[in-house]
Amino acid sequence: MASQPPEDTAESQASDELECKICYNRYNLKQRKPKVLECCHRVCAKCLYKIIDFGDSPQGVIVCPFCRFETCLPDDEVSSLPDDNNILVNLTCGGKGKKCLPENPTELLLTPKRLASLVSPSHTSSNCLVITIMEVQRESSPSLSSTPVVEFYRPASFDSVTTVSHNWTVWNCTSLLFQTSIRVLVWLLGLLYFSSLPLGIYLLVSKKVTLGVVFVSLVPSSLVILMVYGFCQCVCHEFLDCMAPPS
């Protein structure tokens, strides 16, 4: 007995895939669209409507006539179930198992319904879906330079921040200069004060009596002033203590 050629066998298998296994009618793009259940079995939409009309399934659920697996029916509409896109493409191409190239092969919309329809019910032993994603490098325009262009964003408030920072820097420099000048002046006055006695003696020896007397009397006069100031401060404290009312 001669075996059938592989081409005829493939065509017969393809034609079997295009038929509903309940009514054995050919799928079409109108009333008999191939619907995929959650158990990956295919049933035409017309048979699903009949199953719902017979009342064999609970409300909002369709029981698979092959494996009795319950599939939730979104919005209680058969049209909400995902279509088998492989069968639809085959029907669009003439139903002879030919592969049609999509209009845009580089783009594929992945949704739960689309992924469910991509799983072929005839291969129930495989529960794996392999998706290959390739990145196509676009050719750069010759008018564009190879040097990357970097744009800097300068907010409006950045100028005010810069001005405040500049003013703060100037203020710090001025304050530091003032403090340094005060320290130098204090050191010079201290050096002049402690060297006034030997300097006055030197001026007296040099016959400069007036300046010599001033410098010589600087240290004793300052000490007398400090003593008078301390005495007056003590007297004021005692006077305030006497004038204060008793507690």
Curated annotation (Swiss-Prot):
Q: In which tissues is it expressed?
A: Up-regulated in neuronal cells subjected to cell death-inducing injuries, such as oxygen and glucose deprivation (at protein level). Could be up-regulated in Alzheimer disease brains. Highly expressed in innate immune organs such as lymph nodes and spleen and in immune cells such as macrophages and dendritic cells.
Q: What is its EC number?
A: 2.3.2.27
**Listed GO biological process terms:** protein ubiquitination
Molecular function (GO) terms for this protein are: ubiquitin-protein transferase activity; zinc ion binding
Q: How does it sit in the membrane?
A: Multi-pass membrane protein
Pathway membership:
Protein modification; protein ubiquitination
One GO cellular component term = cytoplasm
What does the annotation give as the result of altering V43A? In a colorectal cancer sample; somatic mutation
- Where does the UniProt annotation locate this protein? Membrane; Cytoplasm
Start-end of RING-type zinc fingers: 20-68
Q: What does this protein do?
A: E3 ubiquitin-protein ligase that mediates the ubiquitination of ATP6V0C and targets it to degradation via the ubiquitin-proteasome pathway. Also plays a role in the inhibition of TLR-triggered innate immune response by mediating 'Lys'-48-linked ubiquitination and subsequent degradation of NF-kappa-B component RELA.
How is the subunit organization of this protein annotated in UniProt? Interacts with ATP6V0C.
The entry's protein name is E3 ubiquitin-protein ligase RNF182
